[in-house]
A protein has these predicted regions:
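Conserved GNAT acetyl-CoA-binding A-motif
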Residues: 96-108
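Conserved N-terminal entry element of GNAT/NAT acetyltransferase domains
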Residues: 1-11
Length: 123
């Protein structure tokens, strides 16, 4: 159960970077291009731009979505959070006031691509 969906705070950058780093390391097809520190800095930059909404579960950030205008720049969940409706709720939260959204996803990310199709996105 999600405690809250809220705008990300500067103090969330570390947890967001950890989620990104874990995904990068645990996903076979994902290029291992960035250090944990670089991913924390990237998360901080998205937060500073006001792009990020986080999902808090049990008092901890367990997922986030970043939107720049009509583009979804990132949607990541912590390990073990998939298939609980968190990604869908994050998408719903950022759709307010936006008639059109687009995103890019790795072709190899089959699970995410199926998720986006179920949410009404097209290829």
């Amino acid at each position: 159960v999600i405690d809250e969906l809220r705008p990300a705070r500067t103090t969330d950058a570390g947890t967001m970077g950890e989620i990104l780093y874990r995904f990068q390391q645990d996903t076979d097809w994902m290029p291992k291009l960035y250090t944990g520190a670089e991913l924390i800095a990237s998360a901080g930059a998205m937060i500073d731009r006001g792009w990020v909404t986080v999902a808090v579960i049990d008092g901890r950030v367990q997922g986030f979505i970043a939107r720049d205008g009509e583009e979804i720049c990132a949607l990541y969940l912590a390990d073990g959070i998939n298939r609980r409706g968190v990604g869908r709720k994050l998408l719903i939260a950022i759709r307010d006031g936006c008639d059109r959204l687009h995103l890019r996803s790795f072709e190899a990310n089959e699970w995410a691509n199926r998720f986006y199709l179920r949410q009404g996105f097209t290829e």
